[in-house]
C-alpha cells in the first residue's frame, strides 16, 4: 500500500472518530487492502465497531454516509464502511 493511501485511510479514520467519538471501540481494515492483494480499482473495506445499540447506530448512519461520500469524491476513492455494534459482533 502506498504512503498516500495509508495517509488517506488514517485521515478517514480520524473523520470516523469525529462522528462516533468515544463510542469507537475498534476500526478494522479488511478485504483486499488488508490482505495486500488490492488493485487500482479495489474498494477499501472498513468495519467500525462501536459501543452503542443498533438503534443508536442508525442515528449516525446518514452522517457517516455523507462524510464517506464527500471523502470518496474528494480523493477519488471507494471506501465502503460498515458500522456495527460491538455487542452484536461478540455474539458471533
Where are these regions (language model features)?
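Catalytic core of pol beta-like nucleotidyltransferases
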Residues: 1-26, 35-40, 51-92
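Short beta-strand->loop micro-motif that forms the acidic, two-metal-ion catalytic signature
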Residues: 45-49
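Recognition helix of helix-turn-helix/homeodomain-like DNA-binding domains
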Residues: 32
